[in-house]
Amino acid sequence: MDALVILIPLLPLIAAALIGIGHLWGTLDGEAGERTTAAIASWAISVSCLVALVLLGGDLLEWTAGSFAAGQWLGSANLSVPINFVTSGFSMVLATLFAVLLFIIIRFSINYLHREAGFHRFFFLLSLYASAMLLLVLSGNAVGTFIGWEIAGLCSYLLIAYAYDRPVAAYNAMRVFITVRAGDVCFILGIGLSYAWAKTVDWSELNALSAQLSTGQASAIALCFAIAAFAKSAQLPFAPWLARAAEGPTPSSSGFYGAVMVHSGVYLVLLLQPVFERAPLVMALVAVVGLLTAIYGFVSGLTQTDVKSSLFFATSGQLGLMFLECGLGLWQLASWHLCAHAVVRGYQVLSAPSLMHHILGNPIKPVDREIAGMRWLYTASLQRFWIDQITDWFLVKPVRRLSHDLAYFDDHVVDRAMGIPLPSLRTISTLAQMEKRKIATRQSLYSTLGVVSSLALEKRKITPQQENQDNDFARGSGFTGDLTRRVTAVLYWFEDRLVIRGIGEDMIDYGRRLGLAANKIEQLLLNPGYLTLFVLTILLVAL
């Protein structure tokens, strides 16, 4: 029965692969393919949800073993990273809850994104994200959890930039991606320290061996995972990224920043409860950061003018309270708080568009007079306590400068030295670019048919610039590209002059004569006398 746990993250992954391949091949494209795409995504998450419910029932009835090992992924003399999953406890409860919420979000998205240009791209990313989140909570080791952690972050980045033609969406996606990566570095460091001191990356073994770790070792491991949790769950000083994530579509906002992904950090702290209990200073830090974030979310949310930003600041504040509960040792309360908040906040984000439609024009409840009279607090709330600018100065801008320098070095040194072919820079790299190119082609065709007559279409000629652009498509750069181009030119000359142009009447006549001569030689060899002479000649040569 425990083996069924593999299907929970696997089915959404298969759905994402089918949607992606179908969209790339053109079988799932436009409004005609929406029903198939929606059916693939819905059925995959539905079956995953049912399997999760079955395993949760088996856990409550004590029919499961609590874990399942599907094999070994990495292994050496000192390191073993198995492919194992958890089928009991809070991980199973959270996986079931997330599966149910993701099923609701996918069903909601089918009508919400109907006739959207990025319909298939959205469901591809949402299915991949569902697989990543289910892997994150069900994996029995740090490596598997980190894989789900990273894939979920990548899907978050791509869905924030869903409207990639809008500069604000693309910029906010980049900001969120860079900010969360700072926490991912600490996650990797925590895995390394766990292996260095506990000789394991398995969660259950790490928790069991936490009593043998010194206070300093346990504190270092707990601190690394705590910083990763702060970044993923939008705690100070990483909190501002959550408001920037509002650029994505409403269903993805609900799945990522309302109901599911933002709780990953709290889950990580709950998962490592024994390790954190061995590190009292880190638990105190978790409590302080949670309290400050709760205050920050409450005050900043008072001055927001749109419903999604208000909900996201409220989410950040509630997550801060969960970290405060973990820091105070109220682990059970934090678990219940997480589950309840995921349900409530997911519903609020999904119903936000409908709410705005029904309460349009109604005044909102004013803040208390005491708070309203604090001008400095009002200014700080409008500026979001200047944390966004501080994060820009110390994190985002240095990373952008470094990436700009690396890109310049790659373009002007590496590419010219290696001769990277230009098609690698010009081909379609994302589903979004492919959709954009298809839409542009359709619009160009429609405008041409509407303005230009059929006679003008027949007389249309390709300009020299277009011809040169087409010819330059497969042209390489650098020494290697130049050498390849010259060799290709020689081979083309040989093919054109000696093969293509050489096939004329003379070549056909020569071929016919050669065939007749070969037939005569064959008839002579088949003559018994000549055949005997030929055999004797070969024997004499051999002797």
Which residues does each PLM region occupy?
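...captures the hydrophobic TM-helix bundle architecture rather than a specific catalytic motif
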Residues: 1-415, 419, 425-450, 454-481, ...
